[in-house]
Amino acid sequence: MAIWVDADACPNVIKEILFRAAERTQIPVTLVANQPLRVPPSRFIRTLRVEQGFDVADNEIVRQCAAGDLVITADIPLAAEVLAKGGAALNPRGERYSEATIRERLTMRDFMETLRASGVQTGGPDSLSQRDRQQFAAELEKWLLAVKRQQG
């Protein structure tokens, strides 16, 4: 089991939560990005730098993740591919993607993309709140506990 992070857009506060979890549980965390990242020295935390380009980091995460792995991403198409491979996906706001929710999220994403393409200003997401951080930590902990139970 491993944790993969779509790190280019992942908030630093979420990365910090993941770093602490990696040390505590000794589950490897890999941050995938197209830019250099600073991470604390650890046997359980590494970075993987990919080339610049559309979906290059996403494609690398899909290529390397395995069934049972967790991917941290706000990218809905990436989350859908991870679920199709048997992995789990969690966004930085603490929402765990599922087969039931991913279709709805993809439809909404496509709709918003159509609006933006037609010139409608849709705005971006709100900034990450304390509640979002707590929700993320709680969902991460649920996944970590499930992994621990599986490993005996």
Swiss-Prot record:
Domain of life the protein comes from: Bacteria
Pfam families: DUF188
Family: Belongs to the UPF0178 family.
UniProt-recorded name of the protein: UPF0178 protein KPK_4355
Cited InterPro entries: UPF0178
